Structure formats: C-alpha cells, structure tokens
Amino acid sequence: MPDDRALQDAVIRALADAPFRASLEWRRRALADPDRVERYARFLARHFYHERIVHFFKYSRALARVTGRAPEGILKSPAFDALLPGIILGSRDTAAAVARLVTAHVAAGQAPVPYLADLLRYEEAMMVVEAGARVWRDGAPSGGAGSGERFRPETVEGTVLLELSFDLPSILPKLLQPWTDVPQAPERLTKLLVARSAHGRVAVARSDESVAAVVHLADGTRTLGEIAGVAGLGVEDLEATLQGLVDLGAVRFSSGS
C-alpha cells in the first residue's frame, strides 16, 4: 500500500495536472469520484488563472473602461474551456496559452490606445516568465561574474528581451492612478529585459545593445573573454553587465568542462 504522503501527492498532482488526471495511472487508483475531481480541478484552474491574470494584466484591467475588455473575461469563454483538458497549473506552456487568449481578447476591442499592443506584449511576457518550476531550497552557489574563466555564463531559460515602440515604464504607474484621459506613453524605441529568479521573483529592467548582445551570447559554452570579444566590451564592463544580469535572474554561471 502506498503511504499517506504518496497518496496526497497523487491527489494534488491530479487536481493540478489535467493530462495526469486523464491517465490510466491515475484512473486505475480509483481514489475519488472522477466527476467530482474534474469539477473541483476546473474550479481551481479558473481561480488560479484569475489571480494571475488580475495581477499580470493589471494595466489592461485599468484600461478596461476604454477597451471594453476585462482581461479575466476569457475565463468564461469557450476558448478557455478548450484549454482545460491540457492545463497544468503553474506550467510555462499553460501560462503562455492563457496569456495568448487574454492578449487576443483585449486587442479585439480595437480601442484607440496607441501603445496597447506593446502593453499586451509586456504583460504577456510577465505572466509567462513568472511561470515554471521553482527552486525551494538554496543550493551551492554557482559563482558570480568574477568567478574566473572556468565559469561560463548562461542565459536562464524563459528570460525575455522586448523591443517596444513606446516607453511603457514611464506611464505604467499612471495607469493605476485615477485618470480621466488615457495616460499617453512617449513614442520611442524601448528595450526591456524580463527575467525571473530561481525562487520566482520577476524583475524588469531597461536594456541596451550591449545587454542584449550578452544575453544572446551567454549560452553556457563561451568564456567571459570570448563573449567580451564578440560583444565588443571590455572584460570589466562585461563583468559589471553580467553581475547585473545575475542579480536580475537573467543569467547564471555554470562550470565549463
């Protein structure tokens, strides 16, 4: 007989993981009424993604009186229902699928907000970057930017570089304050880096050409010297850039072979 902890883990997984819930492995255990489990799991899914949509699409929610589209409205749509058989709560794939639905739903309002497309890309990136597995215990330190040539920087999976046509960071706080006329964002090319620490903290920072180059070149195989040469940076400048990226959660260091 499996122990109580194993049974609890199986039930929790079944509630969070729709493909597992439909599997023979789960069904043959016959631990609970399948219809009741399915109803409760779908309730949890809607609640889980309601919280995330409200949090990550809060700026679009603030514009709802202009767009006529509340982001969380997709949770009652046939399109969201169609996702339910494949939903895995907290997974990056599911977060991306839900975020795409929200983006399409809000964009369809065709509101006269010039930066709406940029805003939706930003919010979608935030929601997707936040998703995925967490590290719940600190392991051995992997080194920092000055750890030596044997440590090779690697861009963390899920890190996103955004190129926007409007300077969103300058107006985001204004969207959450009382306003009569829609706050306007300056139209200028803006590069943002969106990253998440191993513990799930999402951070956004302004980026530039050198930061973008380092993020693209840090693949875990190149040394600091090699990256500096390709990116056209001095080693000291590269180390400072990398330290900032490590602090954001965008880059980690691994030992070279």
Residue ranges of predicted features:
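Long, charge-rich, low-complexity alpha-helical segments
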Residues: 1-147, 197-257
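Low-complexity, glycine/alanine/valine/leucine- and proline-rich hydrophobic stretches
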Residues: 152-219
